[in-house]
Amino acid sequence: MPAGLHVLLLRVFGRLPVQARRAVVRLLTPSFTVGANCVIERDDGAILLVRQVYRKQWGLPGGLLERGEEPVDAVRREVVEEVGLTVEVVGEPAVVVAPEPRRVDVVFRARPLGPLPDVIEPLSPEISAVRWHLPGELPELQEEAAQALVTLARSATGEIAGRLHRLVGEPLPGER
């Protein structure tokens, strides 16, 4: 596009009402779905994984945000809906962007609040199984769950970083 035409279009765009500008931007930019997932860690280092009825591999508890919902609120809601646990979110989240299928996942670390039941049963019809898994005994993970764990490990610091790196089988920076 010639520079003069580009400038003219930007000036016209700038004169549009705010709502019209937002509509144009939404129309012309790619849209992504946004999910919130969490790594729930027990005191012994085991993490809680879920198996969805429509997938073979294991994944993290969580799901898509509802319209207007904050990611941290969505992850708390999803964990209660799927497995009946109340969790405390710990630290800063990691963000995983998947250009295809155009999805952004906000991944939190969390720990359960209150006493844990001996067995955690799925509460959602979309979850077929729920289990705690120790770091050396992880089952086959969904691709997005594996990516979330790696991203969270790479953004963590201190003792948490060591535990997450061991969980995903990746050396800490400087250990290579």
Regions from the PLM with identified roles:
Residues M1-N37:
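Acidic, metal-coordinating catalytic segment for phosphate/diphosphate chemistry
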Residues S31-G35, R42, V53, L60, ...:
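Short connector loops at helix/strand junctions that flank enzyme active sites
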Residues N37, A46, A129:
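Conserved beta-strand and immediately adjacent loop positions that scaffold enzyme active sites
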Residues I40-E41, L49, A110, W132:
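Conserved hydrophobic "DFG−1" position in protein kinase catalytic cores
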Residues R42-E81:
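Conserved Nudix-box catalytic region and its N-terminal flanking loop in Nudix hydrolases
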Residues L65-E88, V96-L152, E175-R176:
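Unchanged
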Residues V150-R176:
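Charged phosphate-binding loop/patch that engages nucleotide di/tri-phosphates or the phosphate backbone
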